Amino acid sequence: GDVYKRQILILGGTHFQIPAIKYAKSRGYHVITCDYLPDNPGHKLADEYYNISTTDKNAVLALARSLSVDGILCFASDPAAPTAAYVSEVLGLPGNTFDNICRFGEKHLWRQFLRENGFNVPKAIPYQRAEDIDVADWCFPVMVKPVDSSGSKGITKVTSALDLKSAFDYALSYSRLKIVLIEEFVERVGPQIGGDGFYGKDKLEFVCYGEQVVDERINGYVPCGMKFPALLSSSLEQRITHDIERAIRLSGLHDLSFNLEVMIDKAENIYLMEIGPRNGGNCIPEVIQYYTDVNLVAIAVEAALGNSVPVCPSNNTKCYAYYALHASKEGIYRGYELEKTFRFNIRNSYIFLKNGDKIGAFLGSNQTIGILLLEFDSRKEMDTFFDSPERYVSLYIE
């Protein structure tokens, strides 16, 4: 009879999960997807789709059990990571434990873990009620954020005590756990560092650093691009890599695809702001593959099935980036156009909206119009584009 097809359950069917779905299909795996949005574009590519929310741990567990899947994968989605861990732990599938993944995914637990292990960490206190905040505890500015939100949603920089309550309520509205973190503002020097990596059985096998780009005209916290490679001195890069490897080793996580956010202050202190226990959104794995030839999608899918993939990065003199098309005010999307001045190479593009769709201002990654994956001949070319993207790409919003 037929050779048994390995079955993988992939949580979510958005554009960002499509690379994982396509890769798994290309390997001949039987792909099952689930989320509560049947129209998501990834489901059409899967073998089976179930209308179950990716955050409903017990419903997803029941589904995985009834289908006896061989692996479960969270790819490029924060809220689904604890679900994948929970299911893999209960069913004995490849993966990490629920508690371990939550420690990395929930900001207050992450800050506590870093503090206990002697990493640099801004002062941070979680609160469930605004009344519990003692203003005397804080020197402004502070950052106010949900402990568990994804896509940079619900974050405010607060410069005076008068604005704390509204920032708290705003953050709370984006928190499923209903916990808000207040933390010292880190005065970083240079761009925020981002990127993805993979930690194997007992060591960091791969990491790639990029520089986050934000649109200061809107709110300055939602990344609208990432440039690769990051310009880091080799000594600073080694220190960052050492910190990341040490954090993951101490946590007990293994076979972990992760997304990272790192800040550096004027004293060259390194702050691991986030190690998200899943690959990055915004097509970061795809950009990294153009730059390094390392297929993070393959690594993540195979790890979910207990398989390993050799990692062999190649050298590349070109520069790569993603750019998120976004609106500075709400309106109706009427398409975009590359100007005559646009002389860069588009390796791929994903447009999420149709002409005539409503779009909001770019206050979270959920308001992304689309993503352009760009290749540049030099760092100078890349910087030229990002200095004023609107000179090269026109967006029509009415």
What are these regions (language model features)?
Residues C34-N40:
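Short, polar loop motifs at secondary-structure junctions
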Residues I10-Q17:
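Glycine-rich adenosine-cofactor-binding loop
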Residues G105-L181, K201, A230-H242, R246, ...:
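Active-site nucleotide/adenylate-binding loops and adjacent lid/helix of ATP-dependent enzymes
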Residues G1-Y4:
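Short, small-residue-biased leader/transition segments that mark boundaries at the very start
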Residues S150-S152, G276-T292, N355:
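Glycine-rich phosphate/pyrophosphate-binding beta-alpha loops
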Residues A171-I179, V186-A230, Q238-Y271, G276-I284, ...:
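Phosphate-binding core of ATP-grasp and ATP-grasp-like enzymes
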Residues E116, I133, V301-E398:
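Peripheral (often C-terminal) accessory segments that flank ATP-dependent C-N-forming ligase machineries
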